[in-house]
Swiss-Prot record:
It is an enzyme of class 3 (hydrolase). Induction: By stress. Residues 295-314 are annotated as: Disordered. Mn(2+) 2 binds at residues 86, 118, 167, 242. Mn(2+) 1 binds at residues 58, 60, 86. The lineage of its organism: Eukaryota, Viridiplantae, Streptophyta, Embryophyta, Tracheophyta. The active site is at residue 119. Its cofactor is Mn(2+). This is Serine/threonine-protein phosphatase PP1. The keyword Metal-binding applies. Pfam families: Metallophos, STPPase_N. Its EC number is 3.1.3.16.
Amino acid sequence: MDKAVLDDVIRRLLEGKGGKQVQLSESEIRQLCVHARQIFLSQPILLELRAPMRVCGDIHGQYQDLLRLFEYGGYPPAANYLFLGDYVDRGKQSLETICLLLAYKIRYPDKIFLLRGNHEEAKINRIYGFYDECKRRFNVRLWKIFTDCFNCLPVSALIDDKILCMHGGLSPELESLDQIKEIQRPTEIPDSGLLCDLLWSDPDSSIEGWAESDRGVSCTFGPDVVAEFLDKNDLDLVCRGHQVVEDGYEFFAKRRLVTIFSAPNYGGEFDNAGALLSVDDSLVCSFEILKPADRASGSSSKMNFKKPPKMGKI
């Protein structure tokens, strides 16, 4: 995809502030999906990334809040970004949201990284809004092209060999990170098993071990599971999205797992803040908060993680 064309697409998308709809052509969106899909498949399913990195949780079609996140954190390529999935559904502007992220991915493939969420899956976004938005603004064919692209997204990322990121959480099947590398793409999300859990599971402070999930899919896991997994794999932190949390971020398991959610006033039904996690090159984590009412930002908690020796470029 020509850089000038791509830059023009990005420029038009960035003009969509204040809730203004940006209508790209069907051909442009198709090109975004096809080119991004090729890049996703050319990069590992378990991304190995280097700090500094800004980490964002669920966006869910809240395009104005995505633009606000970039205003706070810096527009690519000024900063490196990792998104934890759930770009579409529920919000009013799923198309603008996913198109801007795909355009940035193509333009700056080593500066912005997109993981798969449980909503980047046909049988889910068929129901929760993305299908209807595609059909209303374009056609069902285009929705199917997005499905082909989503089926190639990576599912996990490792920052400096110490911070493991995914959309959902851990799995009773996951013992070694090498198992993630063995997942073949393109793939749909199965109803059970490792890939399902990575995108669907949740922490639960009231249990030990594993339990069934109220979602009716996947499972929940206790703080003991987090500690055991991190110790066994010489990791410091699990970073995930998937759940609305009041302050935009929430720690679990003695600060060894953090949930990041980046859609403030989620769906217009919650009074939650959104958060942007910044990991500096010493693995100090700090949070930028998008408040629900006035959307004012403010930095919050900081914590240190031991940085491993540099082993050359990965």
